[in-house]
Amino acid sequence: MALELGWGGYWAWDPVENASLIPWLISTAALHTLIVQERRNKLHRVNVALMCLTTISAFFATYLVRSGVVQSVHAFGDGSVGTPLTVFVLGGLLISFWAAFAVPARGRELAGIVSREGFLVMVCWLLLALSVIILVGTMWPVISLLWTPEPHGLDANFYNRVCVPLGMLIMLLLMVCPWLRWDGGLRDAPRFWLALGAFVASGAAFFFLGYRQPVALLA
């Protein structure tokens, strides 16, 4: 089954474009956890693993484009490079696990969830969850061959139903994060509640004026 890009929209979850999105999501997660490492001296192993995964996912994107394992209007090349890239990606994963566990554990334990570092870690996990969902969805034509002779792909509706809510949750967490202290609690509670009230009021006003798309209202 060929999953093709719809040229009438700005994003239609084409497999090759999905492959380029995955490294971006992982590297974005790494940037946020690196902030925790710089400010709080924590998550050293996590950051090593995320930086390694960013590089590996970039080569995996090359594998999708050049191997032809998943059909796309953006893919090119034949399958001759598939095996070397597969070996490289699997070898890179093994090296990444070794490198992550070779880093000595140091620093204090993470603060509670309702803290700046807690929210940044949640953002990291959500970004990684998005990466896994998009990876599985992109490779679904190959995975489906385990139980059916004909490959079956997932259309854009699947990604929109699953990824858009997670993306909105990430946006909400990042909106609240600057108002939190590193050790927990609000930095300036009166201003936070004032800003939250203004946000809810403006969102309600736009909603009644006819702007009904949740992502646009959240932005």
What label would you give each PLM region?
Residues 8-9, 61, 68, 137, ...:
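Glycine-centered flexibility sites
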Residues 1, 57-65, 132-141:
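C-terminal TM-helix exit segments that contain a strictly Trp-centered aromatic cap at the helix terminus
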